Amino acid sequence: MSLGRPWIHDLPGKLHEAALYGYQGIELFFDDLDCLAQTCHNGSHIEAAYHVRELCETLHLSIICLQPFGFYEGLLDRNEHERLVTEKLPRWFHLSRILGTDMIQIPSNFLPADPDTGAARTTGDKDLIVSDLRRVADLGLQQKPSPIRFVYESLAWSNHINTWEECWDVVQRVDRPNFGICLDTYNIAGRVYADPASPTGKTPNADADMHNSLARLRSRTSNTAINISKIFYVQVVDGERLSSPLDENHPFHVPGQPTRMNWSRNARLFPFEQDLGGYLPVLDIAKIIFNDIGFQGWVSLELFSRTLAEPGPLTVREHARRGRVSWNKLVGVLGLRESYPCGYLGGYSLSTWTSGADSTVQHRL
């Protein structure tokens, strides 16, 4: 959750603040579940999952997905691949059922090289990547009483699948009804537009490359045009323009980690926070997703930031407030229509006009 770090800010407190600020749902980060298990349930993830579901039902919060099922596809160590499929995945299926969610998120693999030998531990072989992902999708289809969905997200620093175009190509090749894509404004712009290691904060051809990528995203006529039914949810978030390049002397630098990952972990922002340094073309991307493509569904504000590590309850409340302010601005700028269903928590759904029809989106952390 984007309100505070696990082990610093407890999950029940974050859920209460999310509800108070009118969020309808959450992406459940496994670290939050693990923290709750270790601190309150003698290490039992099962008991923690029941706890989270009961609390979310009381607060009228939906659990949209459990994430991240990471470091999975394209592993060169096929024994580790088998362990993930035969040992870890069944546990995640069980947790998902308890939590009441039907979706597991898989981020594209960014497993670093072997620390001892420097050898790569993943492959860019697209056939193997697709085969690995198709395998979990097929297992998800077999789940009872209903299938489990998987949503694939390209991270800007991943080893091989690091653009939305590559991610969409994989989703098409997997070709399973329960396997879709997550579009994230931060990761879309963070790869082709932003370069935190550059003095300008941008790649050499940032504007042209971003324009071309968005033209492909907007296109509805090409054979590779994105299928709206395959967009399982959307993340809308910005990034901070750093005052100095993120090099080895920068305080955000972590040896062995990709520069964009170090930036992401410390300097994401909610949309419309230009006063805090936001500079990515978030609105341009969002307009295409909501107005041109006509996306309907869950929208997440997935924030990672150094500010989430500040102790105290005010950190959680302030991030909940900032997220809500940001969302309200997005609603206004895109002309979304907000409506409040019954319920003391003030949860809401939002509609925007597209192609003459209502497009409903829902807000979450």
Tell me the role of every PLM-derived stretch:
Residues 1-22, 86, 145, 161-365:
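Histidine-acidic metal/acid-base catalytic patches
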Residues 13, 55-58, 73-183, 190, ...:
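Active-site acidic/histidine proton-transfer and metal-coordination neighborhood
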Residues 21-24, 56-66, 97-106, 295-299:
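Short coil-to-beta-strand
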Residues 23-34, 64-70:
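Short, conserved active-site loops that position catalytic residues or coordinate cofactors/metal ions
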Residues 27, 65, 105, 151, ...:
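Conserved beta-strand positions in the central sheet of alpha/beta enzyme cores
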Residues 27-56, 108-117:
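Glycine-rich, proline-tolerant flexible connector loops at the mouths of alpha/beta enzymes
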Residues 32-34, 69-72, 110-112, 158, ...:
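Feature marks short, surface-exposed loop/turn motifs that line or immediately flank catalytic pockets
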Residues 41-59, 129-142, 213-225, 280, ...:
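Catalytic-core regions built around general acid/base machinery
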